[in-house]
Amino acid sequence: MKNLPLEDNVIYTYLNDIVDTILLRDVISRNNIRNTDFYKNLIVYLAKETWNLFSTKKISDYLKSQNINIATNTVIEYLNASKVACFLNSVSRFDLKWKKIFEILHKYYFSDIGIKNALLWWYSKINISWILENVVYNDLISKGWEVYVWELWNKEVDFVCKKGEEMMYLQVSYLLESESTKQREFAPLLEIGDSWKKYVITMDENASGFIDGVQWINIIDFLVNIK
């Protein structure tokens, strides 16, 4: 790997070989998945729609709209196989008011960003914010945080994080290039009434300061300094 040329086609070939090995050997073969084309389409769909909250029925309905008929139970079976293989992780929705976890809706993140990039190599609409969100999720899990997502009244907090009795809330975005973007990212956090730490995480080099108790922080600073 150290001597691999940093050329797009070489990188793609290398990552794609890894994807084929993981999908074909570690998931499809071990779980005796017969509908391999559907399984691959399912994983690509999840990679492309990272930002979305899903139910297994919603996934099944979408696939039916693409003329792919598959039972909801089969979707559940394939998703569970992917999680057991440790390349796909699900995040449940958290109700801040009632402090409850809902198991119906989930977001899905990839344990290796390279796998996700290989799956989406052909896709021209990759949103950098989706990649950053996945990076932050992986970092949180590695540091022992429980991670959930909150959605209410069409506003979403990307991550509700718990570690023991401690909590924090995170929004992840690429750049806050306009005042309207800044307001959109800060607004959900400003509606949370407790005193736990709240962060808007971006790649802006000048990311710093607070707005009504919500800290704006550069993603590198967050990954390095927030334990």
Q: Which role fits each region the language model picked out?
A:
Residues 3-167:
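Accessory nucleic acid-recognition modules appended to NTPase machines
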Residues 109, 170, 199-201, 215-217:
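Hydrophobic/aromatic beta-strand patches that form the interior of the parallel beta-sheet core
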Residues 146, 197, 213-215:
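Conserved beta-strand segments of alpha/beta enzyme cores
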Residues 149, 195-202:
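Short, hydrophobic beta-strand segments that form beta-sheet elements in well-ordered domains
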Residues 167-177:
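Active-site ExK catalytic segment of metal-dependent nucleases
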Residues 176-187:
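Active-site-adjacent loop/helix micro-motif of nuclease/hydrolase catalytic cores
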Residues 187-196:
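Arginine/glycine-rich "motif VI" loop of SF2 helicases in the C-terminal RecA-like domain
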Residues 205-227:
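Domain-level recognition of nuclease-like catalytic cores that cleave nucleotide substrates
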